[in-house]
Amino acid sequence: MFAPVYLDHNATTPVDPAVLAAMLPWLQGQYGNPSSRHEYGRAARRAIDEARQQVAAAVGAHPTEVVFTSGGSEANNLFIKGAAACLKPGLLGVSAVEHPCIVKPAEQLVKQGWTLAKIAVDGNGCIDVASWKKCLSGQPKLLSVMRANNETGVLHDVAALAETALPTGAWFHTDAVQALGKLPIDFREWNRSGVHVLTISAHKIGGPKGAAAAILDKRVELSPLIAGGGH
């Protein structure tokens, strides 16, 4: 009898044993609220701060630029909806091959007065130059192009694209969920080129589901998706 072979690691990965071992204490005896001032809470806060430093180091960012979320979809929605809420409606450009958690919230913004441009790709799945230039000519306020496509594996040079978008003043986001752990990510370097936000998720690289992050340039103003809990 044959056992199934798992070949869908682009969708999700099993939790690495080392990751599970690191998590177990916080699923058992360590249960403090990191906002609490007693020792249980302080221990949890120290663990979160350490995790924040580790994530920042993995993507070449400063720990203060790391915002934890419950998943890549939430992180992407945080940028699209959160940034749009702080701006007057205008042009929003996303590549035509973005993940649905970018495309769907972008389409929802049309009902709020935004204009959506879906940037075409060529026969190789790369950003079509003419379509990109047309979008930039419309002075977009928000742009999103993924670093690595989850279905085709096509890589987009987001730093180069962001640099061409600098004159528009748009906030540039890249979904780097599929790139994490497979390609070098240097947020500081990308940020100098004009990438303002990138999003990543743990479950693609042997981490748990429900753990992700948005890496944010501090100049980007976002409205929170969830109100309360600011303590």
Walk through the language-model features, giving the residues of each.
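Pyridoxal 5′-phosphate
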Residues: M1-H231
